[in-house]
Structures are given as structure tokens and as C-alpha cells.
């Protein structure tokens, strides 16, 4: 174990600024990377090389693993918490990646929660804020809004920035492509998905060959609440609602129970459209089916300027958060001033800390449109069963239900 790693095990208590911060700064200033892993240090001591795949346990992991339990008799004092935050800030300032997974496939956020720190605790929230900053920075870089200076002396700095940024990516998705392998185009690419055969089972809609979960009946309670949100600010004379992505029709059945005036459904997959025809959705008097991708069909409504919605819901498969950013541009033109927009919120739900990061990112993004996102936290009564599904798309025991309205 290197001096840097040993320091972050907190060998001395109390954790004081004078005992830890100057030494941490000295080590990092001397050139030890803030991403220097335990595996790299061990390999160096043995005179061996370590591959990137074998090297995961960063100084931030060691710091978080060394925190005393929040509920134990040796819990941190307020002064110690303040010092720990300064140590974390210093590591992050020197390029520590916030989103690495250690030798047990654990995120630093997982380690903090395991030690019983609540999700509103300042240490956990510092990790979430680092994730939000990294995601927004990455978006700026990918969008070409940041120009790197082309200078030989800056080449190493630029390379380090790119490496750190790559390590900090969260793949924001709706459903389907969470941790999808590169070759699994069905889950990762909308065009491929629309050409893929689907199968309805007793409790799910899955891709026929890969067994990717498109929609499952554990979402029923979520869809019931969502349907009520969509009509919560309904007009007295009429209520017009849009659902983007029919799937199993769970939320659409709940919307019908609300006796809406007009119920628009936008669906692009031919197998789902065939199921809708078979089950009579095309024959319902108050239902309008928009066949095709929302990217074209909703823009047609926007151009016509004749239909505006009390509620809009979004739940698609194999689309990314970038698609939602594009959707916001359309939503603001189709939603009534008092209307509600909501969506199936599986953004980053592969682990709690990523879920919390995207919770904040959505709040920031919709604020750019003069909208406010409020969440209801639902403890899931029925947890997902992934036995007959290729991969999970939701791994939290609770659900952040979003309600987005103009502020």
C-alpha cells in the first residue's frame, strides 16, 4: 500500500485538517495521480504491470471504505466530516474519477450508503454533486462548447482530462441500453429495436431473441400513480393526454379509467401496433393513435398548433437521455401552461448514486425551459423479477416519480 492509500485509511483519529490535508496535497502535488489504484501500487511493489481492467480501487474508494459507520459509536464528528469533505474536494480537484468501480464492483456511493450514511448526508451529496458536474462537463465537451488549446505543453493535460472524463460517464437511458454490451444493438439502438421481433408473455413484453425487457408488470403501481399525475391539473371542460410508448398498455388502461376527453398514443413498433389493433385500441372513440416515432409525429402536431395536452407521459425502449433532451424542446410547445409532463424514471437506476445524479440533472435541465421537476419517492411493493429477462433495467428498491410543470 502506498503512502497515499495508507493516509486515506485514517490511521489516526480524530481526523484533523492539520494531520491529513497538507500531506494529501503534498503527495498529489508531487505527481502521484489521484486515480492511483491499490492494484497499481501492489503491482509496482511486485515489479509487475497491471492492466486497466484489473485496476479499479482508487484513493476515493479507500477513503470511503475507511469511514466509520454513521450509526456506530465511533461516527465522525462534525469537524471530522468537514475535513473529510476537504479531502474529497482535493482528490476531485486533482482529477479523481467519481464513477470508478472497485475490486468488488462497488461505487464510492455504494460504500458510503453501506456505512449507513443517509442520502441527504453531506458526504454522499458531495459524490452526487461530483457526478452531476462530470456529466454536465462531458456534455459540454461532446457538444463542442469547450475548445482545448492545441499546444504541445498541454498535450498531457488534455489527455488526462479526456481519460478522466471517459471514466466519469454515466449512460443515461430510459429503458434497454443500461449496461448493454456494445454488440447488443437491439437494446442500444432505436432503429434496430424497431426491426426486432417482440413477444408478449403473461407478465412482460420482451424482445423475442435477446429477451430484453421492454416493459414488465412490476411497473403497474408506478403507472397508476403516473396516470393520476397526468390528469391532476385537468381542465374543467376537457382533458387531453398523450402517452409516448404503448408497450403493454399499462398506463393507457389507467388513463382510460380517468375518463379523459382525448387520449393520444404514439407508438412506432409494428408488433406493438399489431397488438393494439388486436386488443381494440384503434377502435376506442376517444383514442388517437399516432403511428411512428415521436420525433416525427409530435413535430407534426407542433406544426399544426391545434392540439395541446393536460398531461404527457414518456416511456420508450432503447432511447437515451439525449433523446429526452430533444423531447423537452417539443414538450414545451405541446403542454398546456398548467399541464404535467412525466416519464418512466429509470435514469441511472442501475445503482442508487447514479439514480441520484440523474435526479438532479433532470431538475437542472428542465429548469432551462422554465419548468420545475418535483419527485415523489415510492417504496416499491413489488420488486422486479429478472429471472426470464436478459438484463435488469432497474436495481433500486424505491422509485423517484417525476412531475414536471411550468414554474
UniProtKB/Swiss-Prot annotation:
<dbReference type="GO" id="GO:0019702">
    <property type="term" value="F:protein arginine N5-methyltransferase activity"/>
</dbReference>
<dbReference type="GO" id="GO:0005634">
    <property type="term" value="C:nucleus"/>
</dbReference>
<protein>
    <recommendedName>
        <fullName>Protein arginine N-methyltransferase 2</fullName>
        <ecNumber>2.1.1.-</ecNumber>
    </recommendedName>
</protein>
<keyword id="KW-0539">Nucleus</keyword>
<dbReference type="InterPro" id="IPR051038">
    <property type="entry name" value="RMT2/GAMT_Mtase"/>
</dbReference>
<comment type="subunit">
    <text>Monomer.</text>
</comment>
<dbReference type="GO" id="GO:0032259">
    <property type="term" value="P:methylation"/>
</dbReference>
<dbReference type="InterPro" id="IPR017408">
    <property type="entry name" value="Arginine_N-MeTrfase_2"/>
</dbReference>
<dbReference type="InterPro" id="IPR026480">
    <property type="entry name" value="RMT2_dom"/>
</dbReference>
<feature type="binding site">
    <location>
        <begin position="267"/>
        <end position="269"/>
    </location>
    <ligand>
        <name>S-adenosyl-L-methionine</name>
    </ligand>
</feature>
<feature type="binding site">
    <location>
        <begin position="246"/>
        <end position="251"/>
    </location>
    <ligand>
        <name>S-adenosyl-L-methionine</name>
    </ligand>
</feature>
<dbReference type="InterPro" id="IPR029063">
    <property type="entry name" value="SAM-dependent_MTases_sf"/>
</dbReference>
<dbReference type="GO" id="GO:0005737">
    <property type="term" value="C:cytoplasm"/>
</dbReference>
<feature type="binding site">
    <location>
        <begin position="294"/>
        <end position="295"/>
    </location>
    <ligand>
        <name>S-adenosyl-L-methionine</name>
    </ligand>
</feature>
<keyword id="KW-0963">Cytoplasm</keyword>
<keyword id="KW-0808">Transferase</keyword>
<keyword id="KW-0949">S-adenosyl-L-methionine</keyword>
<feature type="binding site">
    <location>
        <position position="193"/>
    </location>
    <ligand>
        <name>S-adenosyl-L-methionine</name>
    </ligand>
</feature>
<keyword id="KW-0489">Methyltransferase</keyword>
<feature type="binding site">
    <location>
        <position position="315"/>
    </location>
    <ligand>
        <name>S-adenosyl-L-methionine</name>
    </ligand>
</feature>
<comment type="similarity">
    <text>Belongs to the class I-like SAM-binding methyltransferase superfamily. RMT2 methyltransferase family.</text>
</comment>
<feature type="domain" description="RMT2">
    <location>
        <begin position="186"/>
        <end position="407"/>
    </location>
</feature>
<feature type="binding site">
    <location>
        <position position="223"/>
    </location>
    <ligand>
        <name>S-adenosyl-L-methionine</name>
    </ligand>
</feature>
<comment type="function">
    <text>S-adenosyl-L-methionine-dependent protein-arginine N-methyltransferase that methylates the delta-nitrogen atom of arginine residues to form N5-methylarginine (type IV) in target proteins. Monomethylates ribosomal protein L12.</text>
</comment>
Amino acid at each position: 500500500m502506498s503512502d497515499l492509500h495508507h493516509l486515506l485509511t485514517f490511521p489516526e483519529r480524530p481526523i484533523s485538517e492539520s494531520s491529513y490535508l497538507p500531506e494529501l496535497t503534498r503527495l498529489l502535488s508531487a505527481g502521484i495521480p489521484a486515480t492511483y489504484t491499490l492494484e497499481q501500487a501492489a503491482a509496482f511493489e511486485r515489479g509487475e504491470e497491471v492492466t486497466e481492467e484489473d485496476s479499479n480501487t482508487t484513493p476515493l474508494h479507500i477513503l470511503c471504505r475507511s469511514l466509520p459507520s454513521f450509526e456506530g459509536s465511533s461516527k465522525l464528528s462534525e469537524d471530522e466530516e468537514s475535513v473529510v469533505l476537504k479531502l474529497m474536494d482535493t482528490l476531485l480537484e486533482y482529477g479523481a474519477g467519481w464513477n470508478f468501480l472497485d475490486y468488488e464492483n462497488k461505487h464510492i456511493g455504494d460504500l458510503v450508503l453501506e456505512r449507513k450514511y443517509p442520502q441527504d448526508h453531506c458526504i454522499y451529496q458531495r459524490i452526487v454533486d461530483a457526478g452531476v458536474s462530470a456529466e454536465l462537463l462531458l456534455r459540454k465537451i461532446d457538444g463542442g462548447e469547450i475548445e482545448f488549446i492545441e499546444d504541445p505543453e498541454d498535450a498531457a493535460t488534455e489527455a488526462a482530462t479526456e481519460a478522466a472524463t471517459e471514466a466519469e460517464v454515466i449512460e443515461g437511458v430510459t429503458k434497454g441500453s443500461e449496461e448493454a454490451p456494445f454488440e447488443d444493438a437491439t437494446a442500444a439502438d432505436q432503429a434496430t429495436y424497431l426491426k426486432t421481433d417482440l413477444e408478449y408473455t403473461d407478465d412482460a413484453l420482451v424482445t423475442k431473441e435477446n429477451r430484453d425487457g421492454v416493459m414488465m408488470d412490476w411497473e403497474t403501481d408506478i403507472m397508476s400513480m403516473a396516470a393520476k399525475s397526468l390528469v391532476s391539473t385537468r381542465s374543467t371542460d376537457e382533458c387531453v393526454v398523450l402517452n409516448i410508448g404503448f408497450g403493454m398498455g399499462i398506463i393507457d388502461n389507467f388513463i382510460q379509467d380517468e375518463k379523459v376527453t382525448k387520449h393520444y398514443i404514439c407508438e412506432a413498433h409494428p408488433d406493438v401496433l399489431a397488438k393494439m389493433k388486436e386488443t381494440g385500441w384503434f377502435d376506442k372513440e376517444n383514442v388517437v393513435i399516432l403511428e411512428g416515432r415521436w420525433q416525427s409525429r409530435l413535430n407534426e402536431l407542433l406544426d399544426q398548433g391545434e392540439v395541446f395536452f393536460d398531461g404527457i407521459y414518456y416511456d420508450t425502449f432503447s432511447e437515451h437521455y439525449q433523446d429526452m433532451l430533444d423531447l423537452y424542446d417539443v414538450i414545451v410547445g405541446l403542454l398546456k401552461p398548467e399541464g404535467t409532463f412525466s416519464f418512466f424514471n429509470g435514469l441511472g437506476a442501475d445503482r442508487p448514486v447514479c439514480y441520484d445524479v440523474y435526479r438532479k440533472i433532470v431538475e437542472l435541465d428542465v429548469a432551462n425551459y422554465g419548468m420545475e421537476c418535483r419527485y415523489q419517492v415510492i417504496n416499491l411493493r413489488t420488486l422486479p423479477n429478472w429471472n426470464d429477462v436478459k438484463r435488469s433495467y432497474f436495481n433500486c428498491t424505491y422509485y423517484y416519480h417525476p412531475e414536471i410543470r411550468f414554474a
